[in-house]
Amino acid sequence: MGNLEANDVGNNSRKYNHPFEPYDIQIQLMDAIYDAIDNYKIGLFESPTGTGKTLSLICSSMTWLREYKKNSTFRETEDSESEDEPEWVKQAYQKTIANRTKVRAQEYERLLDDLSENYDVSKVSVLPEKKVKRQKPEQEQDENFIPADYYSDSELDSKYENDKLTSEINELLSRVDGPKETVEPVNDCPVKIFFSSRTHSQLSQFSHQLNMTEFESSLDNIPERIKFSPLASRKQLCIHPKISKLSNVSSINDACIDLQQSSKNSCEYIPKLHNTQSEEIVKKFSDLSFTKIHDIEDLGKLGNKLKICPYYSVRKGIDVTEIIALPYQMLLQDSTRSALNLNIDDSIIIIDEAHNLLDVISSIYSVSITSNELSDITKSLKFYLNKFIKRLNSGNRINIMKLIKLCQVLEKFISSNSKDGKIKHGDEIITSDIFEGTTGDLVNIHKIEQFLNKSKIAYKIESYMQKLNDSESIKNRSNPLLFKITKFLKCLTNPSKEGKFFWDKTNDSVSINYMLLDPSEIFRDIVKRARCVLLCGGTMEPMNDYTNYLFPYIPPEQIKKFSCGHIIPQENLEVFPIGNYNDISFEFSFDKRNNSKMIIELGHAILNIIESTPDGIVIFFPSYKYLNVVMNVWRQNKIIESLTKVKAIFQEPEDSSKVEKVLNDYSSTNKSEKHSALLLSVVGGKMSEGINFSDELARGVIMIGLPFPNIFSAELIAKRKFIEESTIAKGGTKSQAMVNAKNFYENICMRAVNQSIGRSIRHKNDYSIIYLFDQRYGSDKIQDKLSGWVKQKLFTRGRCTDFNQVIKETQDFFRQKLLG
C-alpha cells in the first residue's frame, strides 16, 4: 500500500485522498457529496464529462465511509445484557467487543497481504476438470426440452411449497456460507456504497478509476484495502461452456436454474452444499477478489481458473464489501435485490448517468405486445405441445393449453378492436374489457404467471425451437416473445396503480402497451431504506423533473442540488443562440421545419461557420427523417457541393453496425494535416450519447432546432394525461395541469440537447464553440434549461446573437487559439 500524502484538501480542510491535485470545482463537488451523505439527503449533482466526476464520487463517499467506520463501527457495539451492572462494567464489556471486532478485521487484512504476496491470480491452482457423461443425441433432443413435472396448488408437495420466485437463488446463497475458517472476513459497518450505472463498460470504467485510489485506514496501525465487489448478470459472469453462449439474458437465467434443478446434468461450477473442498474454493475466490480491485472480466477469469461459478461465488464477500458496483436493473428491481440478497438499508446509493433514470425505471416496468407477436407465440406453444404432449404431466399440459387460450383471447381482443376502428392512439384500456364476451376470464392469470416462472417453459420451448431452426432452417421469430409474454402477464396480474394499459398504433401495427407512469412509488422503497440517494450525471439539467416526478414526497430542504462549472478556462468555450440568417427566421418546429427557404439559408449559414472553423464540426439534427429532408434540399440546391469543398461530409447511418466505420473515417480525416470533416448526427442516435468528440473531432457543435419527442406517441399521450390528472387531484387548476405537462415535455427535449452538446468539451485543455440554431434558444425559459456550464457561456442572454457578430467572434476565437 502506498503513502497517503494527499494534496487534496477541501474548503473545510477535509482530506479526500484524491490521487491527483483536484481543481476547485472538484473540491466543491466532493464537499457537496460529503454533506449530502452526512446529512441523510437526496443529492442531484451535475458535473460535466471531463471534470473528474467519477473520482470525485469515489473520493468523497469513501472518505465519509472510512471516517464513519473509524468513529462508529469500532466503538460500543453491544449493550450489556444486565441493566444492574455498574456503568464501568458495561463500558469494559463494550470495549472488549469493539476490540475483538477490530482485531478480526486486522487479521483479515494480514491474510490478504499474504495472499497478495504469494498468489498470482493468473497462476491460481485449479481443480482437475470433471469428466461429464455425454448423453446420446436423441436423449438430449427429447429430455432437455421437457420441464419438470408441474403440480397445481392442491397437489403441491414439499418441493413446491417452498418454491418462491427466488428460491433457487436463496438456496445457492446458503451454499457459499461454508464452515468457519481460521481467518474470516469481518465488517460490522452497516453502511455500504452501491454504485450503479447503465452499461457494463461504464461499470468497468468505475473499477479502473477506483483502482487509482486508496484511503486512510479505519483500523489502527495497519493499511486497509478497499473492499470492492462488482456484480453483473449471468451473461457477463456465467462460465458454463454451453449456457454462456446463449443469446439473451432471459435464456441464460432459465437455463442456469434448469440445470441446477436437473437430477442428471447438474452444473459442475455451482458451489456444492456441505462439500468442504467446494467451500474452500469459494472462500479462496472471495479472498483473492479482495487482494486488489478486480472488474467483471477479472472475476470471470478467476472463476475459470478455480473452476467455480463467479456469478454465485462473488456473493461470499458481500457482507465485508465496502463498495458494490451493479447495473441499473439489479438495483432498481426489488425482486432482483431480494434474489441477490442485497441489503440496501442505511446504505449510500449512487446512480451515475442519471439523466435517463426516469425513463429507465419506466422501461423496466413497461411492456407492449402486438397481435402478430401473440400469433407467433401461439404457434410455438401449439407446435411444442403437439410434439411433447405424451411426455408432459397433466400440470404442464393443462397450463400450456391455458396459456394458448389466453394468447388467443388477447390476439382476438386486438384484432376485433382494430377492425371496428374503435382504437384511438393512447386511449386507456380497462383490463376487464379484454375478457368481455369470452371464457378467458376463467383462466387464473396469476397461476399462469406462476407456471411460467417456475417451470422455465419459455426457455424449454425457446431451446427446442432454436434446435429446429439450426437443424431444419425453420424460421421462428417468436422465441424471445415467450419471455415477453411472461413480463406482459405479470403486468396484467399486478397492474400498478401508477401505470396504465393503453393502445398504440404504429403504421399498420396495433399493440397493447403497459407503461409505468409514476416511477416515484417504485423508487420510494430505495429512498426510504437508504441513508442517502445521489443522482449524478454530466447533464442533469433541467433538474425539476427529478424533484417533481421522482421525489415529490421529499421536502425541498432535504434535496441538495449542485451543478458545477467546467474545468476548462472561461476563454475555451463560446455559446451562440442563432435565430435568423439573411432575414429568414429559424424555427424548426413541426409545422415550419420543412420550409425550403429556411433549410437553404440554414445551409448558407453553416457554410459561413465551417469556413471560419478549423478541424471537425458535429451537427445534430432532431431525427433521421429530418436529416434526410435537409440533405435532399441541400443536394437540389448544390449546398452539399459547396460544403464539401470546405470539409468532407460524413453522415450517421441508421444501421448501428456501420457506425464504427463512419466514426473511424471521420476521426482519421480530422487527424490528417490536410483535411477536416463535418459529421451529420442525430439527437438520441448512436453518436449523441457515450461517444466523446474531443479536440479536433469537435471544434464546433451545431444543434439544429429543439428535438422534441413525438407528442402524438401513445406513451406521451398517456404520460401527459397522467400528469394533468395528478396535478388536478392534488388541488391544482386545469391551467396548472397543462403547464406541468408542457414543462415535462419541454424538459425531455432539453435533456437531449444538453446530452448532445456535452459531447464536445472532454478535458481541461479542450476548446469548442456551440451554435444553437432556432429562435426559441433566445428565450429565457429555454436558456434556463441548458446545463449550467453551457448557460454561463451564452454570448447573449434572453435573445439570439446577430449572425455577423457570431462569425466575427468565431474568427477571433480560433485566431487566438492558433496564436496561443
From Swiss-Prot:
Report the InterPro entries cross-referenced here.
ATP-dep_Helicase_C, DinG/Rad3-like, DNA/RNA_helicase_DEAH_CS, Helic_SF1/SF2_ATP-bd_DinG/Rad3, Helicase-like_DEXD_c2, Helicase_ATP-bd, P-loop_NTPase, RAD3-like_helicase_DEAD
Do you know which Gene3D superfamilies this protein is assigned to?
Answer: P-loop containing nucleotide triphosphate hydrolases
Instruction: Spell out the reaction equation it catalyses.
Output: Couples ATP hydrolysis with the unwinding of duplex DNA at the replication fork by translocating in the 5'-3' direction. This creates two antiparallel DNA single strands (ssDNA). The leading ssDNA polymer is the template for DNA polymerase III holoenzyme which synthesizes a continuous strand; ATP + H2O = ADP + phosphate + H(+)
One Gene Ontology MF term: DNA helicase activity
Per the UniProt entry, what are the Gene Ontology biological process annotations, in alphabetical order?
Answer: establishment of sister chromatid cohesion; interstrand cross-link repair; mitotic G1 DNA damage checkpoint signaling; mitotic sister chromatid cohesion
Q: Where does [4Fe-4S] cluster bind?
A: C238, C256, C267, C309
Where's the motif DEAH box?
352-355
- Descriptive protein name: ATP-dependent DNA helicase CHL1
Tell me, in one coarse class, where this protein mainly resides: nucleus
Q: Which family does it belong to?
A: Belongs to the DEAD box helicase family. DEAH subfamily. DDX11/CHL1 sub-subfamily.
